[in-house]
Amino acid sequence: MIQTETRLKVADNSGARELLVIRVMGGSKRKTGNIGDIVVAAVKQATPGGVVKKGDVVKAVIVRTKSGARREDGSYIKFDENAAVIINADKSPRGTRIFGPVARELREGDFMKIVSLAHEVL
């Protein structure tokens, strides 16, 4: 579960390396987000020459969480880190590559471009 002030690793090559969650999108009372949810975040670390700079406020979709997610068949999926992919207003990724595995739950959330760029879908 991802909440305000959570730090996320960035799983793409947009230039950002670490994000700080400002808000989980989806209503004023929403406290936590899980895989496939959109968050508003600030860039805390960035690589030089990247598209995204330190201090930028961006939208990102959560692709991996330590707490995991329960699937329809009753199984759970967990990852070793919390990670997100920075997206545009039309839900397409800002970067051109996705690093590491992503969860299958992204297919249901209209993030097919991220799923197609990912090396491994679990």
From Swiss-Prot:
GO terms for cellular component: cytosolic large ribosomal subunit. One of its GO terms (biological process) is translation. The keyword Transport does not apply. GO terms for molecular function: large ribosomal subunit rRNA binding; structural constituent of ribosome. It comes from the Bacteria. The keyword Signal does not apply. HAMAP family: Ribosomal_uL14. Binds to 23S rRNA. Forms part of two intersubunit bridges in the 70S ribosome. Belongs to the universal ribosomal protein uL14 family. PANTHER family: 50S/60S RIBOSOMAL PROTEIN L14/L23, LARGE RIBOSOMAL SUBUNIT PROTEIN UL14M. This is Large ribosomal subunit protein uL14. It comes from Lactobacillus delbrueckii subsp. bulgaricus (strain ATCC 11842 / DSM 20081 / BCRC 10696 / JCM 1002 / NBRC 13953 / NCIMB 11778 / NCTC 12712 / WDCM 00102 / Lb 14).
